[in-house]
Amino acid sequence: MTGTLYVVGTGPGSAKQMTPETAEAVAAAQEFYGYFPYLDRLNLRPDQIRVASDNREELDRAQVALTRAAAGVKVCMVSGGDPGVFAMAAAVCEAIDKGPAEWKSVELVITPGVTAMLAVAARIGAPLGHDFCAISLSDNLKPWEVITRRLRLAAEAGFVIALYNPISKARPWQLGEAFELLRSVLPASVPVIFGRAAGRPDERIAVMPLGEADANRADMATCVIIGSPETRIVERDGQPDLVYTPRFYAGASQ
């Protein structure tokens, strides 16, 4: 008899941003696998087992979790944000695809979570109100040339762009180079939003024009949203500015 593998996302980090469905999965699971900081967000019972590992061990982690679930254990794989957005759900599906036949019989439950770009957008207005895309700047699993091509094409097409994994100790130069590329395509006035820990006590949200965007404001936990030429900033007396992208496209019938 096989067990269950839950793949959950904790959201940006605040307990209020974790979905009830995820909370139910956490309550039901016996063993938990994930990156140290994500497991730290859970209040586990004494009878629940925690197995933490490094953030570059996704496939190994998925294989161990599937092995335990195939043995009849209720296992929970923990991601930050949404598990299907640059996170563990894809690694689990890859492991099932390439793994032994018994892994395909494991009950798989993936619970959606609040991903970083949605949390950051909600804190500043509605920058994702029209067409948008999400791009990871990490070149661990894809060439940098692919990333820059996608950035350029997305900017030329008028998408709002949410950047994940914008910078790390191993690649401190990439966000700056991405900004330079985007400045060659987009107006310097396009709003750029730096959002970190949205909804948590240590939240940091900053807005500036692309022409002044400084990559040093970001770290690996920052989500950077680059507006389109249609994105607007609304100044408000006594209230934070709003950033939004209109639902209609300029020149189209409204």
Swiss-Prot record:
Broadest EC class assigned to this enzyme: transferase
Metabolic or biological pathway: Cofactor biosynthesis; adenosylcobalamin biosynthesis; cob(II)yrinate a,c-diamide from precorrin-2 (aerobic route): step 3/10
Pfam families hit by this protein: TP_methylase
Molecular function, one GO term: precorrin-3B C17-methyltransferase activity
Catalytic activity: precorrin-3B + S-adenosyl-L-methionine = precorrin-4 + S-adenosyl-L-homocysteine + 3 H(+)
GO biological process: cobalamin biosynthetic process; methylation
EC number, UniProt record: 2.1.1.131
Keyword Methyltransferase: yes
Keywords: Cobalamin biosynthesis, Methyltransferase, S-adenosyl-L-methionine, Transferase
PANTHER family, A to Z: COBALT-FACTOR III C(17)-METHYLTRANSFERASE-RELATED (PTHR47036:SF1)
Family per similarity comment: Belongs to the precorrin methyltransferase family.
Protein name, entry field: Precorrin-3B C(17)-methyltransferase
Organism: Sinorhizobium sp
